[in-house]
């Protein structure tokens, strides 16, 4: 079966986000009332797996092996069956 994966990787609280800070500052300079901005990466993948649980497990492995740095990143995984 095919599964659609959406993985969002973002910095853990307490880690500096220079790109987010710059974005917030520039938006304020443009007149927007932005207090904070956080930059994250989003991955959209199509994966073949035997079950939704297997797809979730493989997505976790991908995050731990490549997509996220466990020292500084948190991630959210959404798995849906492709129709």
Label every model-predicted segment.
Residues 1-44, 50-83:
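Long, contiguous binding/interaction regions
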